[in-house]
Amino acid sequence: MNKITKARFEIWIKEWDLITKQITDRSGQSGGGLYSFVNDPENMIQEIEQRLGLFLPEDLKDLIRFGYFHAEVDWAFPDGILIPFPNVSEGDLGWNIKDMDFPGLFDDNGDEMQQRRYLAFHMAGNGDLLLFDLESASGSAVVSWSHEEDEFRLLAPSLPDFFERITKLGLIGAYGDSYVPFLGADGLEPDGTNGQLWQAWLKDYRELQWEDVQNDLPAALRLFEMIASDDPELTPRREIGPLLKEYHSVEDILREWIARGEEPQPKRNRRDRLILIGEAMGSDAADWVRTLWTAKAGKDAAERPTSEAPLVARREADSGNDAAQDPAAFLPEADEGVLHRLAAVCLPEDEGLPLVLRDIEREARQSGRRISPPTYSLAAFHSRRVIPWIEPHVSFPFSGWDTLLAASRPQAEDLIRWLQSADALRMTAVSAIGLLPEDEIPALFAGPNGHAERTELLRLLETLHASAVLRKEKTAISEAIAALAFPLT
């Protein structure tokens, strides 16, 4: 494509609007298109050329003559979904021809150098740039500049070629790394292997509906991996299992879903899929989770010093755990974080919580370090039984411990005890009160002593506030007092 026509440009705009609408409708994230127009394009062209001291390439003049001197078109995926290319998580197409300029670049010695080859027309959120290469044959070749690598990457030999290619790829960008999977010698290759894979995936993301795939298990799993984000208000993961079980057996679901981890894909997806399976299937996946823990036990046993081998062998023999002797069964992506989360969401608390606590303690012994806040490992249990375990480990800085305390369903007596304890426990409790969900706070005082317990909590907090010296501490204590300021029925 050698020239932008008004008709083709208007078709692109319709495609961009459709892409952003379909993606944002599904993702629940903000996005859309914003265009700025000019009534006197020829005057704007003259002003820009005078300011820059050059004649604009015809492609840029055409864009201004169509009236579109400025545009912002964007979309974003929610966190937590499984995408085929980890760095492609948003779309960001934009330009501002009126204000484009020559960016200052730096030489190998770190000295800024003046240049008039690359004309920046859009900046990504991380500082990466989209630029025109004025020395290219068309004068409007589009390149990406990565601020971290200080590297230029050709995206298309001309502006119309760029629009055509980036439209096929769903407006990905403008972070420099997001283009890398699709680059060839001549820039972006939407019809290359990765480009075709991405286009097929994005088409399904935009168009697939549950009614289309409910009887097709592989397609249903593909859909849920696309839409099961970390945002519980979008597609709650706990609702996926019951939906699948209406049409498929638990055995078939687990077998097919686990097998998807053997397909070529980013390493991160293999790991995240295991967590998704557990959160979706819950207790239906308990036996599978037990096999993962058994495999981990075998791996840990194989890695112990030789001097410990006889003791390990006796323990395994006593437990009758044959699978634990086979470290080859261990999945590399089933790391401690994965196993701890799966224990929380799939196993009974009486079984899963002791497993995780022992694993955390074992790791601390082996490393010789203090236990850091195991928030990710323990928060998912939402168990008050976590609280007495963490008490002896809490220290300054308490960040992480407060989050874990708030997630562990504390009762008023727990908070009172912590507020009467050492400084680290006291300030952790103060911060945790401010982190408690508003709708959970009344449950603190649901018992027969609720009025007396709240009175004591407020007394302790007010005493702390009166003696606090640092403004940060006073603010945190004030927030805790405010959180407890509601009428008891």
Q: What do the PLM-derived regions correspond to, one by one?
A:
Residues 174-186:
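Eukaryote-biased recognition of electropositive, low-complexity segments
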Residues 409-414, 418-476:
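Extended alpha-helical scaffolding segments
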